[in-house]
């Protein structure tokens, strides 16, 4: 049972990503953004999905030896 995924609330995701709660709600309505689960009336996000979403926006700087 130790390998169960950690789930975050909408507020926790908002604080972690700096994406507003209204924006998260709009993304769900538009079926875009971070994958989520609806448990009755509660919305939960898997931590792994949130981290993957954040990583997908990562831009690696170009390394160049020419000046």
Model-derived regions: residue spans:
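Short amphipathic alpha-helical segments, especially helix-boundary/capping motifs
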Residues: 1, 10, 25-28
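A detector for short, charged/polar N-terminal pre-domain segments
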Residues: 1-5, 63
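Short aromatic/basic micro-patch
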Residues: 7-8, 44
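Anionic, Ser/Thr-rich low-complexity intrinsically disordered regions
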Residues: 10, 47-51
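Residues within the helices of the helix-turn-helix
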Residues: 10-11, 37
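Major-groove DNA-recognition helix of helix-turn-helix-type DNA-binding domains
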Residues: 16-44, 54, 60-67
């Amino acid at each position: 049972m130790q390998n169960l995924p950690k789930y975050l609330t909408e507020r926790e995701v908002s604080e972690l990503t700096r994406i507003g709660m209204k924006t998260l709600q709009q993304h769900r309505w538009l079926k875009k953004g971070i994958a989520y689960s609806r448990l009755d009336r509660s919305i939960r996000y898997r931590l792994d999905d949130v981290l993957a979403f954040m990583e997908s926006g990562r831009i690696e700087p170009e390394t160049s030896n020419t000046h």
